[in-house]
Amino acid sequence: MNLVLMGLPGAGKGTQAGKIVEAYGIPHISTGDMFRAAIKEGTPLGLQAKQYMDRGDLVPDEVTIGIVRERLSKEDCQHGFLLDGFPRTVAQAEALETLLSEIGRKLDYVIHIDVRQEVLMERLTGRRICRNCGATYHLVFHPPAKPGVCDKCGGDLYQRPDDNEATVANRLEVNMKQMKPLLDFYEQKGYLRHINGEQEMEKVFADICEVLGGLAR
């Protein structure tokens, strides 16, 4: 089975990706992992990507697509894959369609884990970290026994600047603007399946399995 997994920050994409690859025996392929592997292996495309990344520039689509092609040609992808973090744009999605066609493959589904912005805000702004030992808490989902105090060492809990409301709201807005055209593209192609990501973790996974039920494991 050939899948793309989509969702905004805080939607639980990483958790569900882990469950999918374990249940269906396909590799979880993230953009970052692909780049790191290509750079480590010293492939020509990996070295090109490294030059851009070292300068803090975006890696051009042609290099990214080339690295995706190399990754999908590996033995562990013969029975399927789960792409996460790619494609990010309609141009990349179109290039992926072409690439898959050239190697005799096609996407089965694009799974979108759908969570309302206010729920994402609660999830992302609730994180608190111990200044002393680094333990992580969440005001709603994993609160400390005593507000503002670490259960483990008694240290002071704080909110990272990246987790404040203004920063999180901006991050979600940027991601949504980027993702919307991609969702529309895959909707028109008939690949897109929306999953309610506001449910319990196991129910989200059960709904994903229901979508994938017609595909061979």
From Swiss-Prot:
GO terms for molecular function: adenylate kinase activity; ATP binding; zinc ion binding. Its main location: cytoplasm. It comes from the Bacteria. Residues 30-59 are annotated as: NMP. GO terms for biological process: AMP salvage. Transmembrane segments: none annotated. It is found in: Cytoplasm. Residues 126-163 are annotated as: LID. Pfam families: ADK, ADK_lid. Zn(2+) binds at C130, C133, C150, C153. The keyword Ribonucleoprotein does not apply. Pathway: Purine metabolism; AMP biosynthesis via salvage pathway; AMP from ADP: step 1/1. PANTHER family: NUCLEOTIDE KINASE. NCBIfam families: adk, PRK00279.1-2, PRK00279.1-3, PRK14527.1. Monomer. HAMAP family: Adenylate_kinase_Adk. Consists of three domains, a large central CORE domain and two small peripheral domains, NMPbind and LID, which undergo movements during catalysis. The LID domain closes over the site of phosphoryl transfer upon ATP binding. Assembling and dissambling the active center during each catalytic cycle provides an effective means to prevent ATP hydrolysis. Some bacteria have evolved a zinc-coordinating structure that stabilizes the LID domain. This is Adenylate kinase. It comes from Geobacillus kaustophilus (strain HTA426).
